[in-house]
């Protein structure tokens, strides 16, 4: 699967770290490093037919459905779509091949669900901190 996405507004909505229970579960880690883009700005270059979806609401704080799209070949979580914000795709920073973007345009600007942040994980320097979900991704 190969995607093309924006690295600035208006298509790039946000870059953030999430400490919620669902992100911990889906990443098998203590947090998820994410960025969100508008559907209208995300392009599937190839492999869209190689995606499989899994949806659930059990571990989502809002109780709303979250659909996860995985690569059938390697199992990588390519993006997520939430029922609360269906026009936005939530992507994982770690899926981006250009490591320079991790430190620049995709560097997390916000942290959400910091009330659930593990005690041995430090805040992202300079990132806005939110106890729970920020109103806008």
Tell me what each language-model feature is.
Residues 2-137:
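A short Gly-Trp-Pro
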């Amino acid at each position: 699967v190969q995607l093309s996405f924006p690295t600035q507004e208006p298509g790039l909505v946000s870059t953030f770290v999430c400490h919620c229970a669902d992100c911990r579960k889906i990443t098998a880690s203590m947090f998820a490093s994410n960025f969100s883009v508008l559907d209208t700005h995300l392009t599937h270059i190839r492999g869209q037919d190689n995606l499989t979806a899994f949806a659930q609401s059990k571990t989502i704080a809002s109780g709303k459905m979250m659909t996860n799209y995985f690569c059938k070949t390697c199992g990588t979580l390519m993006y997520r779509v939430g029922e609360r914000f269906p026009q936005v795709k939530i992507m994982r920073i770690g899926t981006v091949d250009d490591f320079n973007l991790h430190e620049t345009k995709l560097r997390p600007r916000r942290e959400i669900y910091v009330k659930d942040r593990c005690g041995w994980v430090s805040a992202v320097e300079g990132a806005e901190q939110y106890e729970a979900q920020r109103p806008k991704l």
